[in-house]
Amino acid sequence: IIFFYLFSFSYSQANFKEKLIDKLKTTNTLSFDFIQIIGKKKEIGNCHIKYPLFMKCEYPKKKKSIIANGKKFAIIKRRYKKIYYYPLKKTPLFYLLKKENILDLIQNYEPTVIDTHTIEYELVWNNSNKLKIFFDKDSLDFLGWKTTDAYSNEVSFFLKNIKVNITIENKIFTIPQIEDL
């Protein structure tokens, strides 16, 4: 009986990994609404991701956008007419927006948590940076992530109303000039 249980558990785990990998391989774009929590602050908005390395998120209440254009990551604050630039490779988003990183993580590592609703994987790099990625256990939909920002704040990002493989024009990932704000 114990052998059967262990065999069926490992088969089940291998089966969901295979399905998750297949689903990710066929995902080229994601559009979704989000809830972002940093400390006690909650923000809402919408995002578009186009693999590899493109992302745009709008925070309507804050009049703020973030854009990853493949090389740079920019935080655009329209209210203050400011743009802050960062090398994309130095941010946790680089690991999230490069689909091969996620596929490698799933193929080569076991989930850190599997509960009744969620599958969680954790990516650690440079011995201190962590990115936790969450998937729905039943649908295998991407649910969100958790990381730490440059100021050591925990950042949780939860997705809802997800649309997969819709057409997203590349021009939305253009970082504006400061005079255009």
Q: Where are these predicted regions, by residue range?
A:
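Short hydrophobic/aromatic-rich beta-strand segments that constitute the beta-sheet cores
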Residues: F34, M55-Y59, F73-I76, Y121, ...
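Hydrophobic h-region of N-terminal signal peptides that target proteins for export
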Residues: F3-S12
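Cleaved targeting-peptide boundary
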Residues: Y11-D22
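Short, solvent-exposed coil/turn segments at beta-strand boundaries
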Residues: T26, H48-F54, A68-K72, T116, ...
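Flexible, surface-exposed loop/linker segments and immediately adjacent secondary-structure boundaries
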Residues: R79-I119
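A short, Trp-centered hydrophobic/proline-enriched beta-strand micro-motif
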Residues: D22-K42
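An acidic-aromatic
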Residues: C47-Y95, V155
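Gly/Pro-enriched, hydrophobic low-complexity segments
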Residues: D104-L181
